[in-house]
């Protein structure tokens, strides 16, 4: 399991998790979204521009 904190959010991924490759995003211990890392879109929930920017930055840094 990988856990990254940034911008008040916690990003969690699991090795071997079901497809598509995705990240779970939490804030205050509550799941906000599941984000498809391949298609760069939400699977569950709604992501605002700030959160999308953080996810893209983490992908560009190869952290996700």
Task: Give the residues covered by each predicted segment.
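Metal-centered catalytic cores of metalloenzymes
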Residues: 1-64
